[in-house]
Amino acid sequence: MIERTFVKENVKRLLIDEYFKKELSKAGYSHCDIRKTPIGTKIIIYAEKPGFVIGRRGSRIRELTETLAKEFGVEKPQIDVKPVENPDLDAQVVAQKVAQSLERGLHFRRVGHTAVRRVMNAGAKGVIVIISGKLTGERARTEKFMAGYMKHCGEPAEELVDKGRAIAKTKPGVIGVTVKIMRPDVLLPDEIIIKEDAEVKHVVEEEQ
């Protein structure tokens, strides 16, 4: 029973996250934290443009709150909005920006190179931007744009790589966008940090 409830709650969280991705894409939605409290459910939305989430005189917040309660069965939802510290290092925000640029008709190569450059300039250790679909002509294909260092498999790839996905609806068809970012503060298991001000001891052992 407990396991079933746990799975149900996780599915609900995923559905809410997908709903926010769709409804708040223009606000630069990143992710949300959902926490149960004694007085209800606190939902913290992280977005590049908090004002777009709040809406005029809080109108958007009220709409979101009502939807969460009625359609998702969230008990007494209380929404708080916080800004994303560095949008260019947030994979979901970057993915949405790439998708929006493609929808405006910008060439996919220009969009891909620009996104990679902005992420690396923000200090990332590595980035991959994957654009898939009917980019030119009738045949679908996948284009990858990358720079820096990236973990592709194993536990580090799951835990240390920030991932974001978005969809661009263009005239030729739907284009999928995937972004993976290794942030500058990520410490890899095999990485050693040497402090610049650390004193290096030099020991010489004399032979007898």
UniProtKB/Swiss-Prot annotation:
Keyword Ubl conjugation among record annotations: no
Domain of life per record: Archaea
KH type-2 domain residues: 16-85
InterPro entries per record: KH_dom, KH_dom-like_a/b, KH_dom_type_2, KH_sf_prok-type, Ribosomal_S3_C_sf, Ribosomal_uS3_arc, Ribosomal_uS3_C, Ribosomal_uS3_CS
Pfam name, any one: Ribosomal_S3_C
Disulfide bonds: none
Record PROSITE patterns: KH_TYPE_2, RIBOSOMAL_S3
GO MF, one annotated term: rRNA binding
Family: Belongs to the universal ribosomal protein uS3 family.
Its job: Binds the lower part of the 30S subunit head.
NCBIfam families assigned to the protein according to its UniProt record, in alphabetical order: PRK04191.1, uS3_euk_arch
Identification of the protein by name: Small ribosomal subunit protein uS3
Species for this entry: Methanocaldococcus jannaschii (strain ATCC 43067 / DSM 2661 / JAL-1 / JCM 10045 / NBRC 100440)
